[in-house]
Amino acid sequence: MKNTFCVLACFFITIFCQAQSVEEHYYFKNLSIRNGLSQNTVNAILQDRKGFMWLGTKDGLNRYDGLSFRKFKHDAANPRSIGNSFITSLYEDFNGNIWVGTDAGVYIYYPEKEAFEEFDCQSLEKTRIERSVSMIAGDKQGRVWIAVEAQGMFCYDARQKLLRNYPLSEISSNIKCFTFDSGGTLWLGFYGDGLYYSKDNLATVHPYGSPEDGKREFEGGVITKIVQGNYNCLYIGSVKEGVSELNLTSGQVRNLLAIDESGESIFCRDLLPYSDNELWIGTESGIYIYNLRTAQFIHLRASLYDSYSLSDNAIYALYKDREEGLWIGSYFGGVDYYPRQYTYFAKYYPKNIANSLHGKRVREFCRADDGTCLLYTSDAADE
C-alpha cells in the first residue's frame, strides 16, 4: 500500500508539473434545456445570499442549486407566480428579496413566502413601470434604481415607500445601462445618445466630455455596459466601438479593444473585471479575455467539435460567483460555467480536427526515445 501511494503521488506530481508548461486552455461546462433550463437564451444571472444561482431567460426564471433547476413561469391560475416569463434583469436587495425585471414591468420574489408580487407602485409623477426593464441595481443607501425602456429611470426608497420617475425626455428615455462609481456619481449609457453622468441623483444630467471638432466622446453611440474598474476607472462597452476605459482622475478616454482579428467592429454586450489585470468581454463573437497590464487578449469562440468550448458565440451575460467561478449566458446555448482554476490540468480529447486525439478510450501510453508521448486508444495511436 505504501509503495502504491508513492507511485500515485509521483504520477500526479509529474502530470501537474508538465501541465504548468502547457499553454492554458479554457474548459467550460454547459447547462441548457437538456439539463432542465427553461429556455436557452440567458439574459441575466445572479447568485443570491444563500448561494443559489438565478438565471433569467426569454421563457422563465430558473433557480439552480448545483444539481437541478427549479423553474418559475407565469401561471394565470396561480396568483403567487411571476406575472411575466420574459426575464431581462435581476437584483437582490438588502433584505434578500429578488427583483426581477421583465419585458413588461418588475416583479419581486419573496423567499420566505416563495411567492412573486408585482411591483405596481405609482411614482410621485403618477407613472408606473410598464415597459421593458433594461437594468436593476442598488446604491449604498439601499435605494433600488430601475432603467425602463421609453420611461427613463425610476428610483425606489423602501424606507419611505417612495418611487420617483426621471423620464430624461430631454436626452432620451432609452437607458441601456448605468452604474455608480466609487465616488457616488451615477453614469448612464443611452441607446443612441452615448454617455451621461449625474452627481446629484438625476437632479441634473450632463453629457460626458468636451466637444472636440464638434463631437464629444461616445456621442450618438449605443452604450451597452458600464462597470467600475479597480484603478479608479470605468470600463465602457458599446455596439460599434468595442470597449473603452475612462480614467476618473484625469478624465481621459482610451479605447482598449475596438475591432476583431478580421477588422470587424466588436459588438460588446457585457463586461466583467475578473481580477486586477483581467477583463472579460462578452460580445456577439465570443469572449475576449483582455490583459489590462500587457494589452494582450485571448479570443474564445464556440467550436462545433469541441465539447468543452463555449456553447454559443453570442454572449449576453457574465457573472462571477463567490467562489470566483464564471457564469456565461448566451443567446442560443444556455449558460456555460468556468470554475476557478486552483490547479491546472490540460485535457486531450477528440475534436474532429487535425492534431487532436483519436478516440476517447486511452488504453496505454508510453514515452518514446525522442521524448514523444505515445498514446494508444481504442481507435488509433497518437503521439
What are these regions (language model features)?
Residues 1-378:
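Carboxylate-rich, polar loop motifs that coordinate divalent cations or form catalytic acidic clusters
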